[in-house]
Swiss-Prot record:
The gene is rpmI. GO terms for cellular component: cytosolic large ribosomal subunit. GO terms for molecular function: structural constituent of ribosome. This is Large ribosomal subunit protein bL35. Keywords: Ribonucleoprotein, Ribosomal protein.
Length: 64
């Protein structure tokens, strides 16, 4: 049985944690930042976690 290929687009966007949860970066932080408050931009730098509903599907894209 061949190994499952990793979805390269998903591998660049998500990382698995040691406990098996999936870490993600937040959207709306790349451009058009002048109209956003410093507090909002600061919070966009923090990492988020993928919801339980989507974890199973993304785990199949990044198996290793």
């Amino acid at each position: 049985m061949p190994k499952i290929k990793t979805h390269r687009g998903a591998a660049k966007r998500f990382k698995k944690t040691g406990t098996g949860k999936i870490k993600r970066s937040k959207a709306y932080a790349s451009h058009l930042l002048g109209g956003k408050s410093p507090k909002r931009k600061r919070n966009l730098r923090k990492a988020g976690l993928v919801s339980e509903a989507e974890t199973r599907g993304i785990s199949r894209l990044i198996p290793y």
